[in-house]
Amino acid sequence: MIIYNTTELQAIHSFSRLEFLKEVYGSIWVLIPILTLVLGITLGVLVIVWLEREISAGIQQRIGPEYAGPLGILQALADGTKLLFKENLFPSRGDTRLFTIGPSIAVISILLSYSVIPFGYRLILGDLSIGVFLWIAVSSLAPIGLLMSGYGSNNKYSFLGGLRAAAQSISYEIPLTLCVLSISLLSNSFSTVDIVEAQSKYGFWGWNLWRQPIGFIVFLISSLAECERLPFDLPEAEEELVAGYQTEYSGIKFGLFYVASYLNLLVSSLFVTVLYLGGWNLSIPYLFVPELFERGKVFETIICIFITLAKTYLFLFISIATRWTLPRLRMDQLLNLGWKFLLPISLGNLLLTTSFQLLSL
Protein backbone atom coordinates (compact mmCIF):
# COMPACT_ATOMS: atom_id res chain seq x y z
CA MET A 1 0.00 0.00 0.00
CA ILE A 2 1.39 3.42 -1.05
CA ILE A 3 1.18 6.19 1.57
CA TYR A 4 1.35 9.78 0.25
CA ASN A 5 2.57 12.68 2.32
CA THR A 6 0.02 15.46 2.94
CA THR A 7 2.43 18.08 1.60
CA GLU A 8 2.90 16.12 -1.63
CA LEU A 9 -0.88 15.80 -2.11
CA GLN A 10 -1.34 19.54 -1.60
CA ALA A 11 1.43 20.24 -4.12
CA ILE A 12 -0.21 17.93 -6.69
CA HIS A 13 -3.62 19.59 -6.18
CA SER A 14 -2.19 23.11 -6.44
CA PHE A 15 -0.28 22.15 -9.61
CA SER A 16 -3.39 20.68 -11.25
CA ARG A 17 -5.38 23.79 -10.24
CA LEU A 18 -2.67 26.01 -11.73
CA GLU A 19 -2.74 24.07 -15.00
CA PHE A 20 -6.54 24.37 -15.12
CA LEU A 21 -6.35 28.13 -14.57
CA LYS A 22 -3.75 28.41 -17.35
CA GLU A 23 -6.10 26.61 -19.75
CA VAL A 24 -9.01 28.87 -18.75
CA TYR A 25 -6.96 32.06 -19.17
CA GLY A 26 -5.60 30.75 -22.47
CA SER A 27 -9.14 30.19 -23.77
CA ILE A 28 -10.16 33.69 -22.63
CA TRP A 29 -7.18 35.29 -24.39
CA VAL A 30 -8.11 33.45 -27.59
CA LEU A 31 -11.72 34.67 -27.38
CA ILE A 32 -10.85 38.34 -26.66
CA PRO A 33 -9.66 39.19 -30.24
CA ILE A 34 -12.65 37.36 -31.75
CA LEU A 35 -15.16 39.16 -29.52
CA THR A 36 -13.43 42.50 -30.18
CA LEU A 37 -13.69 41.92 -33.94
CA VAL A 38 -17.38 40.93 -33.67
CA LEU A 39 -18.09 44.07 -31.60
CA GLY A 40 -16.27 46.24 -34.14
CA ILE A 41 -18.16 44.64 -37.04
CA THR A 42 -21.48 45.22 -35.25
CA LEU A 43 -20.70 48.90 -34.69
CA GLY A 44 -19.54 49.20 -38.30
CA VAL A 45 -22.83 47.79 -39.60
CA LEU A 46 -24.85 50.16 -37.38
CA VAL A 47 -22.88 53.12 -38.75
CA ILE A 48 -23.40 51.93 -42.35
CA VAL A 49 -27.17 51.67 -41.86
CA TRP A 50 -27.28 55.17 -40.36
CA LEU A 51 -25.08 56.57 -43.14
CA GLU A 52 -27.22 55.01 -45.86
CA ARG A 53 -30.38 56.48 -44.38
CA GLU A 54 -28.81 59.93 -44.01
CA ILE A 55 -27.18 59.97 -47.46
CA SER A 56 -30.36 58.65 -49.09
CA ALA A 57 -32.39 61.34 -47.33
CA GLY A 58 -29.94 64.01 -48.51
CA ILE A 59 -30.06 62.82 -52.12
CA GLN A 60 -33.88 62.75 -52.06
CA GLN A 61 -34.05 66.15 -50.27
CA ARG A 62 -35.99 64.90 -47.26
CA ILE A 63 -35.45 64.53 -43.52
CA GLY A 64 -33.83 61.26 -42.47
CA PRO A 65 -34.11 59.44 -39.11
CA GLU A 66 -34.02 61.89 -36.20
CA TYR A 67 -35.98 60.46 -33.25
CA ALA A 68 -33.98 57.35 -32.27
CA GLY A 69 -31.00 58.86 -30.48
CA PRO A 70 -29.06 62.01 -31.42
CA LEU A 71 -29.32 62.60 -35.20
CA GLY A 72 -31.13 59.25 -35.47
CA ILE A 73 -27.92 57.26 -34.95
CA LEU A 74 -29.76 54.56 -32.96
CA GLN A 75 -32.33 53.95 -35.71
CA ALA A 76 -30.65 50.71 -36.86
CA LEU A 77 -30.60 49.45 -33.26
CA ALA A 78 -34.31 50.26 -32.93
CA ASP A 79 -35.08 48.38 -36.16
CA GLY A 80 -33.09 45.35 -34.99
CA THR A 81 -34.83 45.34 -31.60
CA LYS A 82 -38.22 45.48 -33.32
CA LEU A 83 -37.34 42.50 -35.53
CA LEU A 84 -36.25 40.48 -32.47
CA PHE A 85 -39.78 40.64 -31.05
CA LYS A 86 -41.55 39.80 -34.30
CA GLU A 87 -43.10 36.36 -34.70
CA ASN A 88 -41.14 33.74 -36.66
CA LEU A 89 -43.47 32.37 -39.32
CA PHE A 90 -42.85 29.21 -41.35
CA PRO A 91 -44.37 28.41 -44.77
CA SER A 92 -47.00 25.68 -44.43
CA ARG A 93 -45.56 23.37 -47.12
CA GLY A 94 -41.96 24.50 -47.09
CA ASP A 95 -38.83 22.66 -46.00
CA THR A 96 -38.35 23.85 -42.42
CA ARG A 97 -34.71 22.77 -42.15
CA LEU A 98 -33.59 24.52 -45.33
CA PHE A 99 -35.73 27.52 -44.42
CA THR A 100 -33.95 27.81 -41.05
CA ILE A 101 -30.38 26.99 -42.14
CA GLY A 102 -30.32 29.34 -45.16
CA PRO A 103 -30.00 32.70 -43.31
CA SER A 104 -27.39 31.25 -40.93
CA ILE A 105 -25.16 30.07 -43.80
CA ALA A 106 -25.41 33.51 -45.44
CA VAL A 107 -24.30 35.32 -42.27
CA ILE A 108 -21.61 32.87 -41.06
CA SER A 109 -19.90 32.62 -44.46
CA ILE A 110 -19.55 36.41 -44.61
CA LEU A 111 -18.40 36.70 -40.97
CA LEU A 112 -15.55 34.24 -41.62
CA SER A 113 -14.19 36.60 -44.29
CA TYR A 114 -13.32 39.20 -41.63
CA SER A 115 -10.69 36.88 -40.13
CA VAL A 116 -8.18 37.69 -42.92
CA ILE A 117 -8.72 41.48 -43.11
CA PRO A 118 -5.78 43.48 -41.66
CA PHE A 119 -6.60 46.75 -39.89
CA GLY A 120 -2.89 47.24 -39.14
CA TYR A 121 0.42 45.39 -39.40
CA ARG A 122 -0.44 43.14 -36.44
CA LEU A 123 -4.17 43.85 -36.30
CA ILE A 124 -5.46 40.74 -38.03
CA LEU A 125 -7.20 37.69 -36.66
CA GLY A 126 -5.41 35.22 -38.95
CA ASP A 127 -2.56 36.17 -41.29
CA LEU A 128 -2.87 33.22 -43.67
CA SER A 129 -0.69 32.65 -46.72
CA ILE A 130 -3.86 32.21 -48.81
CA GLY A 131 -5.85 35.01 -47.19
CA VAL A 132 -7.51 36.51 -50.30
CA PHE A 133 -8.50 33.11 -51.64
CA LEU A 134 -10.00 32.15 -48.28
CA TRP A 135 -12.24 35.21 -48.63
CA ILE A 136 -13.30 34.21 -52.16
CA ALA A 137 -13.89 30.58 -51.17
CA VAL A 138 -15.89 31.42 -48.05
CA SER A 139 -17.95 34.22 -49.63
CA SER A 140 -18.98 31.90 -52.47
CA LEU A 141 -20.89 29.81 -49.90
CA ALA A 142 -23.37 32.63 -49.20
CA PRO A 143 -25.41 32.13 -52.42
CA ILE A 144 -25.89 28.48 -51.42
CA GLY A 145 -27.68 29.71 -48.29
CA LEU A 146 -29.83 32.04 -50.40
CA LEU A 147 -30.71 29.20 -52.79
CA MET A 148 -31.61 26.98 -49.82
CA SER A 149 -33.82 29.74 -48.45
CA GLY A 150 -35.59 30.19 -51.77
CA TYR A 151 -36.14 26.46 -52.24
CA GLY A 152 -37.21 25.86 -48.64
CA SER A 153 -39.83 28.63 -48.79
CA ASN A 154 -42.01 26.74 -51.31
CA ASN A 155 -42.78 30.01 -53.05
CA LYS A 156 -42.23 30.78 -56.72
CA TYR A 157 -40.96 34.30 -56.04
CA SER A 158 -38.55 33.07 -53.36
CA PHE A 159 -37.26 30.27 -55.58
CA LEU A 160 -36.71 32.62 -58.52
CA GLY A 161 -34.86 35.01 -56.21
CA GLY A 162 -32.60 32.21 -54.98
CA LEU A 163 -31.85 31.11 -58.56
CA ARG A 164 -31.05 34.68 -59.54
CA ALA A 165 -28.71 35.05 -56.55
CA ALA A 166 -26.82 31.88 -57.51
CA ALA A 167 -26.56 32.86 -61.19
CA GLN A 168 -25.41 36.38 -60.31
CA SER A 169 -22.79 35.12 -57.86
CA ILE A 170 -21.32 32.65 -60.37
CA SER A 171 -21.25 35.30 -63.12
CA TYR A 172 -19.34 37.88 -61.09
CA GLU A 173 -17.23 35.62 -58.87
CA ILE A 174 -14.95 34.71 -61.81
CA PRO A 175 -13.98 38.30 -62.83
CA LEU A 176 -13.51 39.10 -59.14
CA THR A 177 -11.14 36.14 -58.72
CA LEU A 178 -9.15 37.10 -61.83
CA CYS A 179 -8.69 40.64 -60.47
CA VAL A 180 -7.46 39.24 -57.15
CA LEU A 181 -5.04 36.98 -59.05
CA SER A 182 -3.60 40.03 -60.83
CA ILE A 183 -3.02 41.76 -57.48
CA SER A 184 -1.39 38.63 -56.06
CA LEU A 185 0.97 38.47 -59.05
CA LEU A 186 2.05 42.08 -58.46
CA SER A 187 2.58 41.45 -54.74
CA ASN A 188 4.06 37.93 -55.09
CA SER A 189 1.80 36.78 -52.26
CA PHE A 190 -1.77 35.76 -51.42
CA SER A 191 -1.48 37.15 -47.88
CA THR A 192 -3.49 40.32 -47.27
CA VAL A 193 -0.75 41.74 -45.03
CA ASP A 194 1.91 41.19 -47.72
CA ILE A 195 -0.32 42.84 -50.34
CA VAL A 196 -0.64 45.97 -48.18
CA GLU A 197 3.10 45.99 -47.44
CA ALA A 198 3.89 45.71 -51.18
CA GLN A 199 1.87 48.89 -51.80
CA SER A 200 3.73 50.87 -49.12
CA LYS A 201 7.10 50.84 -50.92
CA TYR A 202 6.35 53.78 -53.24
CA GLY A 203 3.92 55.77 -51.13
CA PHE A 204 0.71 57.09 -52.66
CA TRP A 205 1.75 56.15 -56.21
CA GLY A 206 2.45 52.59 -55.11
CA TRP A 207 -1.23 51.85 -54.61
CA ASN A 208 -2.59 49.10 -56.83
CA LEU A 209 -5.28 51.57 -57.89
CA TRP A 210 -2.70 53.20 -60.20
CA ARG A 211 -0.96 49.97 -61.20
CA GLN A 212 -4.21 48.12 -61.93
CA PRO A 213 -6.81 50.73 -63.00
CA ILE A 214 -8.73 48.32 -65.24
CA GLY A 215 -8.72 45.64 -62.55
CA PHE A 216 -9.94 48.21 -60.01
CA ILE A 217 -12.97 49.14 -62.13
CA VAL A 218 -13.83 45.46 -62.78
CA PHE A 219 -13.37 44.65 -59.07
CA LEU A 220 -15.59 47.59 -58.12
CA ILE A 221 -18.43 46.50 -60.42
CA SER A 222 -18.09 42.83 -59.45
CA SER A 223 -18.12 43.57 -55.73
CA LEU A 224 -21.30 45.65 -56.10
CA ALA A 225 -22.88 42.73 -57.96
CA GLU A 226 -21.73 40.28 -55.26
CA CYS A 227 -23.33 42.50 -52.62
CA GLU A 228 -26.58 42.58 -54.66
CA ARG A 229 -26.68 46.35 -54.52
CA LEU A 230 -28.42 48.54 -57.07
CA PRO A 231 -28.17 48.38 -60.06
CA PHE A 232 -27.55 44.64 -59.40
CA ASP A 233 -30.33 43.83 -56.90
CA LEU A 234 -32.11 41.40 -59.25
CA PRO A 235 -32.50 38.59 -56.61
CA GLU A 236 -34.81 40.79 -54.51
CA ALA A 237 -36.37 43.10 -57.09
CA GLU A 238 -39.56 44.39 -55.43
CA GLU A 239 -41.47 45.09 -58.65
CA GLU A 240 -40.84 41.58 -60.01
CA LEU A 241 -40.34 39.17 -57.08
CA VAL A 242 -42.00 40.90 -54.08
CA ALA A 243 -38.83 40.48 -51.97
CA GLY A 244 -37.09 37.57 -53.69
CA TYR A 245 -35.76 34.86 -51.38
CA GLN A 246 -36.79 36.99 -48.35
CA THR A 247 -40.51 36.94 -49.21
CA GLU A 248 -41.59 34.31 -46.65
CA TYR A 249 -39.26 35.44 -43.85
CA SER A 250 -40.11 37.44 -40.75
CA GLY A 251 -38.64 38.23 -37.36
CA ILE A 252 -35.02 37.39 -36.57
CA LYS A 253 -34.52 35.35 -39.74
CA PHE A 254 -35.44 38.33 -41.89
CA GLY A 255 -33.10 40.39 -39.71
CA LEU A 256 -30.25 37.96 -40.48
CA PHE A 257 -30.64 38.64 -44.21
CA TYR A 258 -30.71 42.35 -43.46
CA VAL A 259 -27.47 42.06 -41.47
CA ALA A 260 -25.84 39.79 -44.08
CA SER A 261 -26.30 42.36 -46.86
CA TYR A 262 -24.55 45.08 -44.85
CA LEU A 263 -21.85 42.69 -43.63
CA ASN A 264 -21.14 41.79 -47.25
CA LEU A 265 -21.02 45.46 -48.25
CA LEU A 266 -18.58 46.24 -45.42
CA VAL A 267 -16.27 43.30 -46.17
CA SER A 268 -16.20 44.20 -49.88
CA SER A 269 -15.30 47.79 -49.04
CA LEU A 270 -12.54 46.62 -46.70
CA PHE A 271 -11.07 44.40 -49.41
CA VAL A 272 -11.13 47.31 -51.88
CA THR A 273 -9.09 49.24 -49.30
CA VAL A 274 -6.67 46.36 -48.70
CA LEU A 275 -6.16 45.34 -52.33
CA TYR A 276 -6.18 48.71 -54.10
CA LEU A 277 -5.95 51.63 -51.65
CA GLY A 278 -2.90 50.73 -49.58
CA GLY A 279 -4.68 49.37 -46.51
CA TRP A 280 -3.63 51.01 -43.26
CA ASN A 281 -0.81 53.07 -44.86
CA LEU A 282 -1.40 56.82 -45.06
CA SER A 283 0.94 57.00 -48.10
CA ILE A 284 1.16 60.82 -48.08
CA PRO A 285 4.80 61.74 -47.27
CA TYR A 286 4.14 65.34 -46.19
CA LEU A 287 1.52 64.27 -43.69
CA PHE A 288 3.49 61.33 -42.32
CA VAL A 289 5.20 62.12 -39.03
CA PRO A 290 7.28 59.17 -37.73
CA GLU A 291 7.50 60.67 -34.23
CA LEU A 292 3.77 60.12 -33.77
CA PHE A 293 4.21 56.36 -34.05
CA GLU A 294 7.04 56.37 -31.52
CA ARG A 295 4.75 57.56 -28.73
CA GLY A 296 3.23 54.15 -28.19
CA LYS A 297 1.65 51.10 -29.71
CA VAL A 298 -1.86 52.23 -28.76
CA PHE A 299 -1.62 55.46 -30.75
CA GLU A 300 -0.19 53.59 -33.75
CA THR A 301 -3.06 51.09 -33.58
CA ILE A 302 -5.68 53.86 -33.45
CA ILE A 303 -4.11 55.66 -36.44
CA CYS A 304 -4.00 52.44 -38.52
CA ILE A 305 -7.65 51.62 -37.76
CA PHE A 306 -8.72 55.19 -38.53
CA ILE A 307 -6.91 55.25 -41.91
CA THR A 308 -8.36 51.86 -42.91
CA LEU A 309 -11.91 52.84 -41.96
CA ALA A 310 -11.64 56.27 -43.64
CA LYS A 311 -10.77 54.63 -46.97
CA THR A 312 -13.45 51.99 -46.45
CA TYR A 313 -16.24 54.46 -45.77
CA LEU A 314 -15.22 56.49 -48.82
CA PHE A 315 -16.00 53.44 -50.97
CA LEU A 316 -19.20 52.87 -48.98
CA PHE A 317 -20.32 56.40 -49.87
CA ILE A 318 -19.80 55.59 -53.56
CA SER A 319 -21.87 52.39 -53.18
CA ILE A 320 -24.72 54.21 -51.44
CA ALA A 321 -24.72 57.07 -53.97
CA THR A 322 -24.78 54.53 -56.83
CA ARG A 323 -27.99 53.07 -55.41
CA TRP A 324 -29.86 56.33 -56.06
CA THR A 325 -28.12 57.14 -59.35
CA LEU A 326 -28.36 54.13 -61.66
CA PRO A 327 -31.49 52.17 -62.66
CA ARG A 328 -31.79 48.42 -62.16
CA LEU A 329 -30.53 46.19 -64.98
CA ARG A 330 -32.55 43.44 -66.58
CA MET A 331 -31.44 39.87 -65.92
CA ASP A 332 -30.12 39.40 -69.46
CA GLN A 333 -28.19 42.68 -69.24
CA LEU A 334 -26.67 41.63 -65.92
CA LEU A 335 -25.48 38.27 -67.26
CA ASN A 336 -24.20 39.81 -70.51
CA LEU A 337 -22.20 42.38 -68.54
CA GLY A 338 -20.60 39.65 -66.45
CA TRP A 339 -19.85 37.05 -69.12
CA LYS A 340 -19.34 39.14 -72.28
CA PHE A 341 -17.56 42.19 -70.88
CA LEU A 342 -16.10 41.83 -67.38
CA LEU A 343 -14.81 38.27 -67.83
CA PRO A 344 -12.79 38.97 -71.04
CA ILE A 345 -11.51 42.29 -69.64
CA SER A 346 -10.37 40.73 -66.35
CA LEU A 347 -8.79 37.80 -68.21
CA GLY A 348 -6.92 40.17 -70.53
CA ASN A 349 -5.80 42.21 -67.52
CA LEU A 350 -4.46 39.05 -65.87
CA LEU A 351 -2.55 38.05 -69.03
CA LEU A 352 -1.03 41.54 -69.32
CA THR A 353 0.00 41.51 -65.66
CA THR A 354 1.57 38.06 -66.06
CA SER A 355 3.47 39.19 -69.17
CA PHE A 356 4.87 42.29 -67.44
CA GLN A 357 5.88 40.25 -64.41
CA LEU A 358 7.70 37.71 -66.62
CA LEU A 359 9.48 40.46 -68.57
CA SER A 360 10.63 42.14 -65.35
CA LEU A 361 12.36 38.96 -64.10
UniProtKB/Swiss-Prot annotation:
Function: NDH shuttles electrons from NAD(P)H:plastoquinone, via FMN and iron-sulfur (Fe-S) centers, to quinones in the photosynthetic chain and possibly in a chloroplast respiratory chain. The immediate electron acceptor for the enzyme in this species is believed to be plastoquinone. Couples the redox reaction to proton translocation, and thus conserves the redox energy in a proton gradient.
Family: Belongs to the complex I subunit 1 family.
PROSITE patterns (alphabetical): COMPLEX1_ND1_1 (PS00667), COMPLEX1_ND1_2 (PS00668)
Enzyme Commission no: 7.1.1.-
Record-linked Pfam families: NADHdh
Oligomeric and partner information: NDH is composed of at least 16 different subunits, 5 of which are encoded in the nucleus.
Annotated GO CC locations: chloroplast thylakoid membrane
MF-aspect GO terms: NADH dehydrogenase activity; oxidoreductase activity, acting on NAD(P)H, quinone or similar compound as acceptor; quinone binding
NCBIfam families: PRK06076.1-2
Record localization: Plastid, Chloroplast thylakoid membrane
UniProt-listed InterPro entries: NADH_UbQ_OxRdtase_su1/FPO, NADH_UbQ_OxRdtase_su1_CS
Cross-referenced PANTHER family: NADH DEHYDROGENASE SUBUNIT 1, NADH-UBIQUINONE OXIDOREDUCTASE CHAIN 1
Reactions catalysed according to its record: a plastoquinone + NADH + (n+1) H(+)(in) = a plastoquinol + NAD(+) + n H(+)(out); a plastoquinone + NADPH + (n+1) H(+)(in) = a plastoquinol + NADP(+) + n H(+)(out)
Protein name (record): NAD(P)H-quinone oxidoreductase subunit 1, chloroplastic
GO biological process, one term: photosynthesis, light reaction
HAMAP family: NDH1_NuoH
Keyword tags: Chloroplast, Membrane, NAD, NADP, Plastid, Plastoquinone, Quinone, Thylakoid, Translocase, Transmembrane, Transmembrane helix
Bilayer-crossing regions: 28-48, 99-119, 128-148, 249-269, 270-290, 301-321, 341-361
Topology in membrane: Multi-pass membrane protein
Main location: plastid
